[in-house]
UniProtKB/Swiss-Prot annotation:
Range of residues in the leader sequence: none
InterPro entries: Exonuc_VII_S, Exonuc_VII_ssu_sf
Cited function: Bidirectionally degrades single-stranded DNA into large acid-insoluble oligonucleotides, which are then degraded further into small acid-soluble oligonucleotides.
Organism: Anaplasma phagocytophilum (strain HZ)
EC identifiers of the protein: 3.1.11.6
Reaction catalyzed: Exonucleolytic cleavage in either 5'- to 3'- or 3'- to 5'-direction to yield nucleoside 5'-phosphates
One GO BP: DNA catabolic process
Keywords: Cytoplasm, Exonuclease, Hydrolase, Nuclease
GO cellular component: cytosol; exodeoxyribonuclease VII complex
Similarity comment: family membership: Belongs to the XseB family.
Protein name: Exodeoxyribonuclease 7 small subunit
Pfam (any one): Exonuc_VII_S
Amino acid sequence: MSIHISSKFEEAMKELENIVAELESGNVPLERSVELFNKGKELHKYCDKVIKEISLHIESVDPDDKELSAKFSDD
């Protein structure tokens, strides 16, 4: 996993946190709320993809580490 992807992931997470905070404030017009929601869905999809890729990488490095694999499972 390259540093470029890591920094992009961190930026996406921060933007997602900002979107959640803005939506939770309750002071957002409906149209803006829909825009933020859609952007949040895109960011969530990207972050979830990165996390799954990292999980697969970790499992490939040490596939016998059941404890480590369990921490990254969807259960």
